[in-house]
């Protein structure tokens, strides 16, 4: 006998249509890219506490001057959380983040997409008539949420775009392209640093510069490139 951690080796039943759904999503992305239409991957990153809370990781600091944090991570009700909602442009390998203050809702998710379109999308795709959104099956952009569908219809009415949504199969959100192309670089940028000022999050755009980013459209692909933040 020995002490051991729990190991998650099984993820439940493997539905026979899961692989077919991945292939369908991949073909949809390819079709939109060939037509010059925007295809984006969206999701909500882990909520971040604002204040001197411990954040795992290490970063370079002057010797003998570590950044001081609280002993206990008790949440301060007076300080809102940062809720980063990301939009990753598959064709241009660019990411954009909208940061909320309180709750991760369907209205917030669609508003983030609307702001991405107003800030970047309409300039990058002036002739676009269609928009493909790749998202996981749960959370604020879950396929069962009626508010998500209502807000998407409002987005389509406001922008004049035909909006197509492709949901990844349940339990496969780690294959969502934004996880590897955008959120992973944000996590590396934030590691070992307290998020003491919400202005560090506001309108935070991340550009992930990968040599394969322009061509790799598989939702299961990963990037080995680097990232630079731009204002």
Q: Where are the regions a protein language model picked out?
A:
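Charge-mixed, compositionally biased segments that are often intrinsically disordered regulatory tracts
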Residues: 1-67
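Well-ordered, non-membrane alpha-helical segments in soluble/globular domains
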Residues: 22, 109-116, 145-152
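Short, flexible loop/turn elements at secondary-structure junctions
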Residues: 29, 44-48, 89-91, 137-139, ...
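Extended hydrophobic secondary-structure segments that form protein cores and membrane-embedded regions
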Residues: 41, 130-137, 165-170, 204
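Electropositive, glycine- and tryptophan-enriched low-complexity nucleic-acid-binding patches
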Residues: 67-134, 138-139
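RNase H-like two-metal-ion nuclease catalytic core shared by retroviral integrases
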Residues: 143, 165-187
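Two-metal-ion acidic nuclease core segments, chiefly of the RNase H-like superfamily
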Residues: 148-164
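A cross-taxonomic marker for long C-terminal extensions/tails that follow the last structured domain
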Residues: 179-180, 191-231
């Amino acid at each position: 006998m020995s002490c051991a951690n729990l190991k998650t080796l099984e993820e439940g039943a493997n539905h026979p249509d899961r692989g077919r759904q991945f292939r369908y999503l991949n073909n949809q992305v390819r079709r939109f890219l060939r037509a010059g239409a925007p295809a984006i991957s969206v999701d909500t990153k882990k909520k971040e506490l604002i204040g001197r809370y411990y954040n795992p990781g290490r970063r370079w600091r002057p010797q003998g001057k570590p950044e001081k944090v609280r002993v206990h991570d008790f949440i301060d009700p007076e300080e809102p959380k940062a809720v980063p909602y990301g939009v990753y442009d598959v064709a241009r390998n660019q990411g954009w983040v909208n940061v909320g203050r309180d709750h991760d809702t369907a209205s917030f998710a669609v508003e983030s997409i609307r702001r991405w379109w107003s800030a970047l999308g309409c300039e990058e795709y002036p002739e676009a008539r269609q928009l493909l959104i790749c998202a996981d099956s749960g959370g604020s952009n879950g396929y069962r949420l009626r508010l998500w569908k209502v807000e998407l219809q409002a987005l389509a009415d406001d922008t004049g775009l035909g909006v197509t949504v492709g949901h990844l199969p349940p339990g496969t959100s780690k294959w969502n392209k934004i996880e590897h192309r955008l959120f992973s670089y944000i996590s590396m940028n934030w590691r070992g640093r307290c998020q003491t000022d919400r202005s560090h999050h506001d309108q935070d755009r991340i550009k992930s510069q990968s040599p394969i980013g322009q061509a790799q459209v598989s939702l299961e692909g990963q990037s080995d490139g680097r990232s630079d933040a731009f204002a």
